[in-house]
UniProtKB/Swiss-Prot annotation:
Protein name: Chaperone protein HscA
Native source organism of the sequence: Salmonella agona (strain SL483)
Keyword Ribonucleoprotein part of the UniProt annotation: no
Gene from which the chain derives: hscA
Statement: the UniProt record of this protein carries the keyword Chaperone: yes
Keywords: ATP-binding, Chaperone, Nucleotide-binding
Matches recorded under CDD domains: ASKHA_NBD_HSP70_HscA
Length: 616
């Protein structure tokens, strides 16, 4: 007997009601788009069957081309052919020029110091270039799926900061795409491998792409993907292998002129071809700029050995953060085209003591994971139990009195997350509070990074400590931060979304974490000193107000004792002796106890004046 299947409105899984979603791997060197079709995940090819789209855009006055056609124009029109734009996302022009001094583009700075690339199509920023790549991928998906996309999941390196993530979302919006979520690339790979092989335990995802390196330590258990720790370098990848090999070929060929962009591109193309060939062969013949020679795999390995070692040092730091040893790692997932280099696979295998997983094409695995996640988020799998937990790389907090940082969300907290903490006013009658949002691991403001400032006004004028302000930090699934401050009694509030124009480099993040450990003892002492100084200032300010109001309650001798104690506290508070300040505060408290009792009695008498015992 046939059964009639009934679904709630909007939740039908009928094929014609499926929403169209895609996962996009927006890579430094190549990009891909993937989708789930008929229950199967697949990357979508172009008309010629090519799945990879080179992340290259060639601009002309009358328009632009993306992908292979653009890459083919690179040698003839270098200044108008933009590649590896992902490296520029969220960075200042000064940072880009310091990191990549030989880029063949004509740069100009925007009013806030961000890069603008001068092309035949006009001045373009990295967001616009990225948007053109995303448009090409979206067009491929729409044509293949015979419809417009309802949403996309776009992957980003795990170490991308707020500015880089926001830039990626802006590029997607410019391309007309609805972003369901930004997803860390290693996490996307874990989704792909987790569903394919059903592994449970600690997994390391080693992601070496064209321009970025990420290492993530994840725990997979019962459908839950939890990122224990992340690390990496957003300015290290296969492109660096290419440039090292290109420089080596230049030396061998005796080419001294670096100003000829056409020769620069020819050298780079020869280096890329040689690198690919050396993954399968021990030697390769190179013919460039009239020079012919031979490059061996051993020579190539010598050139890149130091860079591979840098990736392994990042792996060691991530393992330490996660609290696991290399032998605790169940599997090592290899992601990114650069993991095809034999030396990389060999060194990674030696480090972790096991053969890395390469079952899924390392170029496609991230896009596959993103497509699976997009299919879930768009609503095609409402019953999915997969839970995804990412982490923030650095602690978030607020500046408090004395230049201290009060951490609200510690680093490696899983996101999305919201945490609230209550603060109070420092002075009598205070009606406004400045909120200074900080990022970092140190105890003092001067050693952390300022993210944003905003003010909460309209606080009721109460005695110091009388008003209560709740500050809420919220980090969404894309790693973007918003902060809200609200005075509890009135409900007055102010908020800000943190969107810095450009953010921290991975080296700076790693340095901040390292410094927090190196200076831990020193920072604790500095914090204790600052806290005692703040308390001393509070005590002295309260005492001044009390003496102004009720000095008549004291005899001359009593007033002198209090003045002496206050003067001593004021003097020692200028120094660095924590114990001396603490003792001076206790002495002021001792000398003012009788004064405080008399003030209390006086307040009670005033409150009861004119009232009978029965009324009380």
């Amino acid at each position: 007997m046939a059964l009639l299947q009934i679904s709630e409105p909007g939740l039908s899984a009928a094929p014609h009601q499926r929403r169209l979603a895609a996962g996009i791997d927006l890579g430094t060197t190549n990009s891909l788009v993937a989708t789930v079709r008929s229950g199967q995940v697949e990357t979508l090819p172009d008309h010629e069957g090519r799945h990879l789209l080179p992340s290259v855009v060639h601009y002309q006055q009358q328009g632009h081309t993306v992908g292979y056609a653009a890459r083919d124009n690179a040698a003839q029109d270098t200044a108008n052919t933009i590649s590896s734009v992902k490296r520029m996302m969220g960075r200042s022009l000064a940072d880009i020029q310091a990191r990549y001094p030989h880029l063949p583009y004509r740069f100009k700075a925007s009013v806030n110091g961000l890069p603008m690339i001068d092309t035949a199509a006009g001045l373009l920023n990295p967001v616009r270039v990225s948007a053109d790549i995303l448009k090409a991928l979206a067009a491929r998906a729409s044509e293949s799926l015979s419809g417009e996309l309802d949403g996309v999941v776009i992957t980003v390196p795990a170490y991308f900061d707020d500015a880089q993530r926001q830039g990626t979302k802006d590029a997607a919006r410019l391309a007309g795409l609805h972003v369901l979520r930004l997803l860390n690339e290693p996490t996307a790979a874990a989704i792909a491998y987790g569903l394919d092989s059903g592994k449970e335990g600690v997994i390391a995802v080693y992601d070496l792409g064209g321009g970025t390196f990420d290492i993530s330590i994840l725990r997979l258990s019962r459908g839950v993907f939890e990122v224990l720790a992340t690390g990496g370098d957003s300015a290290l990848g296969g492109d660096d292998f290419d440039h090292l090999l290109a420089d080596y070929i230049r030396e061998q060929a005796g080419i001294a002129d670096r100003s000829d962009n056409r020769v620069q591109r020819e050298l780079l193309d020869a280096a890329i071809a040689a690198k690919i060939a050396l993954s399968d062969a021990d030697t390769v013949r190179v013919n460039v700029a009239g020079w012919q020679g031979e490059i061996t795999r051993e020579q190539f390995n010598d050139l890149i050995s130091a860079l591979v070692k840098r990736t392994l040092l990042a792996c060691r730091r991530a393992l330490k953060d996660a609290g696991v040893d290399p032998q605790d790692v169940l599997e090592v997932v290899m992601v990114g085209g650069s993991t095809r280099v034999p030396l990389v696979r060999e060194r990674v295998g030696e480090f972790f003591g096991r053969t890395p997983l390469t079952a899924i094409d390392p170029d496609k695995v991230v896009a596959i994971g993103a497509a699976i996640q997009a299919d879930i988020l768009v609503g095609n799998k409402p019953d999915s139990e997969m839970l995804l937990l990412d982490v923030i790389p650095l602690s978030l907090g607020l500046e408090t009195m004395g230049g201290l940082v009060e951490k609200v969300i510690p680093r490696n907290t899983t996101i999305p997350v919201a945490r609230a903490q209550d603060f109070t006013t420092f002075k009598d009658g205070q009606t406004a509070m400045s909120i200074h949002v900080m990022q970092g691991e140190r105890e003092l403001v001067q050693d952390c990074r300022s993210l944003a400032r905003f003010a909460l006004r309209g606080i009721p004028p109460l005695p110091a400590g009388g008003a209560h302000i709740r500050v809420t930090f919220q980090v969404d699934a894309d790693g973007l931060l918003s902060v809200t401050a609200m005075e509890k009694s009135t409900g007055v509030e102010a908020s800000i979304q943190v969107k810095p124009s450009y953010g921290l480099t991975d080296g700076e993040i790693a340095s901040m974490i390292k410094d927090s450990m190196s200076f831990a003892e020193q920072d604790v002492k500095a914090r204790m000193l600052a806290e005692q100084k703040v308390e001393a200032a509070r005590v002295l300010e309260s005492l001044t107000g009390a003496l102004t109001a009720d000095a008549a309650l004291l005899s001359a001798a009593e007033r002198q004792c209090i003045d002496d104690a206050a003067a001593h506290l004021s003097a020692v508070a200028q120094g660095d002796d924590v114990d001396a300040i603490e003792q001076a505060i206790k002495n002021v408290d001792k000398q003012t106890q009788e004064f405080a009792a008399r003030r209390m009695d006086q307040s009670v008498r005033r409150a009861l004046k004119g009232h009978s015992v029965d009324e009380v």
